[in-house]
Amino acid sequence: MEITEVRVFPVNEEKLKAYVTITLDHCFVIRDLKVIHGNTGLFIAMPAKRRKDGTFKDIAHPLNSDTREKMERTILAEYDRELKKGAAAPARATGTDPHED
């Protein structure tokens, strides 16, 4: 499995830093991953749905730690590139909807 596209949609919140959409093997899209700033730094949160009891259940997630680490490295690298690109641009469009294609 290859991550063939990563789209980062930065947000300016205290903990939530970006929404992310990834494409796997040019044929499968996963939306609503999140870049979160936690106590130990940045990490990726998988898309989740709130259950009736108030807990969250992942909608999609890696089945092993190697895949999770590969996804996290790839997504965080693209997040860093997006931040640098945004810092270099004098005027940046805001309000981009991560659900549009």
UniProtKB/Swiss-Prot annotation:
The keyword Cell division applies. InterPro entries: SpoVG (IPR007170), SpoVG_sf (IPR036751). It comes from the Bacteria. Pfam families: SpoVG (PF04026). One of its GO terms (biological process) is sporulation resulting in formation of a cellular spore. Keywords: Cell cycle, Cell division, Septation. Belongs to the SpoVG family. This is Putative septation protein SpoVG. It comes from Anaeromyxobacter dehalogenans (strain 2CP-C). The gene is spoVG.
